[in-house]
């Protein structure tokens, strides 16, 4: 694993750097600076040291505690003249509490000493017995061995004597005699060994009996003393309160107060036998807070009890864990402190802070490690229940195809659609290029077709992907005179990814330079094969200008839709997809929805991504009010709680309350995911964070007219970032530029960019007072180019050295003021006094510095041109020789561009 700096580790575990350095020193690890690197083994060493320190260095409570209590009360005594007066009485009590552990430690120590003594005696006795037994066995073995050898020797001598007496014995008789002698010797040896073992055993038993008698005598002598010590310890234990917790103190104090109260009540009853006084005393005894002293203060209650009882054991809980949870929330569910959870995670090898978001699996392991039962909960149960409660009993019927027109920029997509719709849409787009998704439906003789017109510019990749995702057929427009271009290839990839059939419209066929065969050949490289060549893609030659081939294109689209057998449920609750969304100043959030199933009606409750609402009004693409819309129809809906993101699914639900709950849940989940992405406390991106401070940033606040344009601009600007300059989107949104946007731009030193929107009056005041850079755009080309220029201004300039003169040393002479002075001839360019120089010897630079003096005919001059002689003194350098060259150069700053 990569090493981490002390500073980064301190940030990860949320502790000061100085404290972490001190902990390293305490653990025996040499770390003195915040930039020092910490390896994995050093982290484990520190963790082990902290565990040991926290586990062993517990604060020792005092073994004995003395409490003093003062109780103040007033009694009424009879004074002179028959009047009663109040006298204050103060009762002081002193209690001494002894910690249970202290007495128990003494008792355990005494028991341990007694046990050790008895064990030592038993061990000594057993060792003595074993030693005696082993000595006896060894002695018996040696004696038996000696006896065996003697018997064998005796038998051998007898056999030899018998052999001598019988000079010619038989061989068998000799062998038999020898065997008999060996058997006799063996029996004698065994008998001797048995006798010796019996003798040793008797001696060991006598020694053991002697040791036992000594132990009995010692116990009889010390028994009374040991009994007295045990009785003294028991008496001492019974004289003290062994518990020092608050419950025992409260119970004892309550008993003392009852005795004191009863004593005062009896004294008052004797001296004041009036009925009213008795009633007053009874009331006081029933309600101790009712009686007040002279100063009107409440008297202390008799019993100071509270309802909380400290649990005697750990309570095992059922911990409900969602998909993501923070460490603090997990600790709260388990009713423990966050520090305990962090400790448990550190023991398991995971470092986390109290606000860090952890996943469900990690939280489950931590909770089970701490002894709790885990209940895993799916966060989207309510969402699934709401979305599943739908009317889906109707039969599916044929529907109109949804056709997306895609292709490279300026290949004539919108112009082709204009001719079909008999309207001029392209002229209304800024710069003549499409920057929004346009959704239109067209009634033809053969049926209805819904068209989605997507932008062709490179910045609108997400828009094209969104269009391909919600379409049935893709019409790929390729200019016959231009061929396949980058966005054409991208459109093919989107269509292939969405598994949507492609109909190729070869546009601009009326131009003289049109070459449709080249288009077929180029598209074949990307697996778009014509039906003429055995493929499955229809190729139609059209001209958006003259209208040639338009009917053939519509017929090809309808044929393709018949092959696909497109069907959808017409009746029932509608569902669709958001094609585009924007914020209208007078109407509020407006979303363009393409209905895919069911019928969308005015008054329906719609759940749309992170937003919800009841449809207040519906309009078609021409702005006409409509009451309902069926499948494959694009409509604008009003009444949502906010501007949904383009591409979100729009679904009609039954209950507005549940729709609101689901929307709020989605917003919270989106926030959690966003926070989880922003977690920087990871070792993997440590080096990226370290170099982040060296990168210049261009902050931008973007406001656009529709949500799709905001996404496209953000993606395009982020892609401009380089290693030296980074584009940071501080804020973005849909609608006009407000005072909040201007304040955000002022706080972050950002450029305000308005795309087809303008700033209101309050925002203009802030912009003028703060001198902010506000720029309006209607074409995305201009926006990207100007942001590039702003990024170029943030680039560090490049410096280049340019040689302006060269002088050759002809002679060297000494000067008392300058040292070695070179007499030179300027051979190239100009030698200037203010510029830096290099001294070259054999075309190798040996010194780099500056001129101290430049003279011509004993006069100081600022420059000497080519072909003239001069005297040059180099500052702080005297090793100038004949034949050296002095090169004069200047540094030029060159502004870099992206």
Curated annotation (Swiss-Prot):
Q: Region G1: what ranges?
A: 407-414
Q: Which family does it belong to?
A: Belongs to the TRAFAC class translation factor GTPase superfamily. Classic translation factor GTPase family. IF-2 subfamily.
Q: Where is the composition biased (Basic residues)?
A: 288-297
Question: What role does it play?
Answer: One of the essential components for the initiation of protein synthesis. Protects formylmethionyl-tRNA from spontaneous hydrolysis and promotes its binding to the 30S ribosomal subunits. Also involved in the hydrolysis of GTP during the formation of the 70S ribosomal complex.
Q: Where is this region: G3?
A: 453-456
Q: Where is the composition biased (Basic and acidic residues)?
A: 101-161, 180-196, 203-217, 226-239, 278-287
Q: What Pfam families does its record include? A: EF-G_D2 (PF22042), GTP_EFTU (PF00009), GTP_EFTU_D2 (PF03144), IF-2 (PF11987), IF2_assoc (PF08364), IF2_N (PF04760)
Q: Where is this region: G2?
A: 432-436
Q: Which InterPro entries match?
A: DNA-bd_dom_put_sf, EF-G-like_DII, EFTu-like_2, IF2_assoc_dom_bac, IF2_II, IF2_N, P-loop_NTPase, Small_GTP-bd
Instruction: Just give the chief location class.
Output: cytoplasm
Task: Name the encoding gene, please.
Answer: infB
- The residues the record assigns to binding GTP are 407-414, 453-457, 507-510
Q: Which GO terms describe its cellular component?
A: cytosol
Instruction: Give me the ranges of the annotated region G4.
Output: 507-510
| Domain tr-type G span(s) in chain numbering | 398-567
Which protein is depicted?
Translation initiation factor IF-2
The annotated region (Disordered) lies at: 96-304
